[in-house]
């Protein structure tokens, strides 16, 4: 039994979000939620919301017991990039890349 939750177009760099995702992969949902709650990273808050959604999906749609769930898969894919221009000295300009992510969490029974 698996339950999936996604957050598409999350406004965070995939590189930064993967740091948090790698920490909770394979852990029980209780451990993962605890770890995310006390993390200072912006990505931790976003991943926590997706994880809570996946847990709710498992409970509501599959009738799963929360105590038996673990983070089976979690991955962060690259979303679209917004390109912006930053004016610089002497008429030049730099490109600013505002990256986004697609966060996917899959929870399953042990």
Swiss-Prot record:
The keyword Ribosomal protein applies. PROSITE patterns: RIBOSOMAL_L22. CDD domains: Ribosomal_L22. InterPro entries: Ribosomal_uL22 (IPR001063), Ribosomal_uL22_bac/chlpt-type (IPR005727), Ribosomal_uL22_bac/org-type (IPR047867), Ribosomal_uL22_CS (IPR018260), Ribosomal_uL22_sf (IPR036394). Belongs to the universal ribosomal protein uL22 family. GO terms for molecular function: rRNA binding; structural constituent of ribosome. Part of the 50S ribosomal subunit. This is Large ribosomal subunit protein uL22. This protein binds specifically to 23S rRNA; its binding is stimulated by other ribosomal proteins, e.g. L4, L17, and L20. It is important during the early stages of 50S assembly. It makes multiple contacts with different domains of the 23S rRNA in the assembled 50S subunit and ribosome. It comes from Vibrio cholerae serotype O1 (strain ATCC 39315 / El Tor Inaba N16961). One of its GO terms (cellular component) is cytosolic large ribosomal subunit. The keyword rRNA-binding applies. GO terms for biological process: translation. Keywords: Ribonucleoprotein, Ribosomal protein, RNA-binding, rRNA-binding. Transmembrane segments: none annotated. The gene is rplV. NCBIfam families: rplV_bact. Gene3D superfamilies: Ribosomal protein L22/L17 (3.90.470.10).
């Amino acid at each position: 039994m698996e339950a999936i939750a996604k957050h598409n177009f999350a406004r965070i760099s995939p590189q930064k979000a993967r740091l948090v995702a790698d920490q909770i992969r394979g852990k029980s949902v209780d451990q993962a939620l605890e770890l995310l709650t006390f993390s200072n990273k912006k990505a931790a808050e976003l991943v926590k919301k997706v994880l809570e959604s996946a847990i709710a999906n498992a409970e509501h749609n599959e009738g799963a017991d929360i105590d038996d769930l673990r983070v089976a898969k979690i991955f962060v894919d690259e979303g679209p990039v917004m390109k912006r221009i930053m004016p610089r000295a002497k008429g030049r300009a730099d490109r600013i890349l505002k990256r986004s992510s697609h966060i996917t969490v899959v929870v399953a029974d042990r």
